[in-house]
């Protein structure tokens, strides 16, 4: 799912268990997934892809004002919105989602909290993101059924870290420079170390016995 969104910009928008098969072989340790039923497919623009990557990095670094700017660019907030007013609400919703560590993040719980937040603050869901949210939440739900200890950011952030450190495209390099250097051009060693440690940490903690073969 991450590759579909962040690499190809073309994704399966209805990834329920009947539309995915776990197959042996391939380049992956635990085999690979085969998708069927392509009646509900969608695309994501390059601009949205890169902004989502930035939003994930800002989420990990708990930079809520920058994340509010990402939401604004993606269309979840109007251009007239005072973003400073949203820092604390975002911190309450997203900061509490982590618990003691990044891996405690649960997208379904955060989505539910955001739904309540929309009654008090001018968040809106652009129509082009409806299928993206559906697809990601569906896949997280399936993963949680297979492994109740599954944590989506333990999969997503290492993927993003690897992309930032190995992708030579101008857009990704710009994001990396924004992460590693502050506004005065000084290198932020802690953030660079975080990216590197995440990249080299072994995150393959999925039990192969839990992968169904249909």
Task: Label each PLM-derived region with a short phrase.
Residues 1-214:
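Conserved catalytic cores of large enzyme domains
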């Amino acid at each position: 799912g991450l590759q579909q969104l962040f690499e190809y910009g073309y994704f399966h928008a209805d990834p329920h268990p009947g539309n995915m098969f776990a197959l042996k072989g391939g380049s992956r340790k635990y085999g690979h997934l085969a998708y069927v039923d392509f009646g509900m497919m969608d695309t994501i623009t390059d601009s949205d892809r890169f902004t989502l990557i930035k939003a994930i990095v800002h989420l990990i670094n708990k930079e809520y004002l920058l994340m509010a700017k990402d939401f604004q660019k993606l269309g979840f907030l109007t251009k007239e919105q005072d973003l400073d007013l949203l820092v604390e609400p975002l911190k309450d919703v997203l900061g509490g989602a982590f618990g003691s560590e990044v891996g405690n993040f649960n997208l379904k719980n955060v989505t539910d909290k955001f739904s309540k937040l929309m009654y008090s603050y001018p968040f809106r869901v652009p129509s082009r993101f409806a299928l993206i949210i559906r697809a990601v939440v569906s896949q997280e739900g399936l993963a949680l059924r297979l492994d109740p200890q599954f944590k989506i950011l333990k999969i997503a952030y290492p993927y993003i870290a690897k992309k930032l450190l190995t992708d030579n495209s101008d857009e990704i390099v710009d994001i990396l420079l924004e992460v590693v250097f502050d506004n005065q051009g000084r290198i932020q060693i802690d953030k660079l170390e975080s990216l590197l440690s995440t990249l080299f940490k072994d995150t393959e903690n999925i039990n192969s016995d839990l992968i169904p073969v249909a």
